[in-house]
A protein has these predicted regions:
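Carbohydrate-active catalytic/glycan-binding domains of CAZyme proteins
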Residues: 1-273
Length: 273
């Protein structure tokens, strides 16, 4: 089965997708805009309807004075025990505290909770996954801002309580990626007998790519796919570039698809990395 692209034209970066029964729900980054984190719904991955936003009020997030590359970005949408979760990085004005937050709702159309901050984890692009024991793991791109100059630590994870934000384990170094720069945007999946770790690498410009690894548990150890990257438009001739930041979902016919971002080329860029 084929699907037309783009799913959404215009400014709809960092997609994350969830299949719930016959319905698909997709959330995007919204950065400094409120209402934020738009939620679209579809039954066929072709026809989509905007059904609401995660962020609709000041009690959830304050965006006044936020820079264009600040605000909220790289959300993940998941469902566990009948409750929908969206986790996302929230960055305030320059110098103000930021963090990874979790919002919940009984339906993706909302209303969504005021949210909680996960205390003690430093990074961006959070993901949520539940293992066979019901434990919740937050994977993220480790990024320490405390020194004034961000220090990157690759893909990391920790066991958390998603309802309180409490961190229940030490931070674990998951994966350094497949060899491109700055692994980020992780997503964990249990498929069959393996766990899979999907990531974005290569920076968010022309070198953007999607890579994958697999292992026996949500904490690895991880075996990088020999054909990484599994998706990229790294070139000087593709009409759509910067392709990456993917999330996997099962299609109506039982196959698999990936949603990702892409940019039509215009002017100069930071090139490859």
């Amino acid at each position: 089965m084929t699907y037309p692209n783009p799913l959404f034209p215009g400014f709809n970066p960092d997609p994350s997708i969830l299949k719930d029964g016959e319905d698909y729900y997709l959330v995007n980054s919204s950065f400094e805009f409120l209402p934020g984190l738009p939620i679209h719904q579809s039954k066929d991955l072709v026809n989509w309807t905007l059904i609401g936003h995660v962020l609709t009020r000041d009690s959830q997030v304050t965006l006044q004075g936020v820079f264009t590359n600040g605000g909220v970005w790289a959300p993940t949408i998941r469902k566990h025990d009948g409750l929908f979760y969206v986790t996302v990085k929230i960055a305030g004005k320059f110098g103000e505290p930021a963090g990874m937050h979790i919002f919940t709702a009984e339906h993706p159309a909302g209303p969504w909770s005021d949210g909680i901050k996960v205390l003690g984890l430093e990074g961006i692009d959070p993901d949520l996954a539940w293992d066979e024991n019901g434990d919740c793991w937050m994977a993220f791109s480790g990024l320490n801002f405390s020194t004034g100059k961000p220090v990157h630590h690759g893909i990391q994870s920790a066991k958390i309580n998603p309802n309180t934000g409490e961190v229940l384990s030490e931070v674990i170094d998951l994966w350094e990626g497949a060899g491109l720069m700055f692994p980020e945007g992780p997503h964990l999946y249990r498929i069959g007998e393996y766990w899979y770790l999907l990531a974005a690498e290569g920076g968010t410009d022309r070198g953007h790519a999607v890579t994958i690894a697999r292992g026996p548990s949500p904490v690895g150890p991880w075996e990088s796919a020999p054909h990484n990257p599994v998706l990229t438009a790294r070139s000087e001739f593709h009409t759509v570039q910067n392709v990456g930041h993917g999330d996997l979902v099962q299609t109506p016919d039982g196959g698999w698809a990936m949603v990702c971002l892409g940019v039509r080329t215009f002017g100069v860029s930071n090139g490859f990395s």
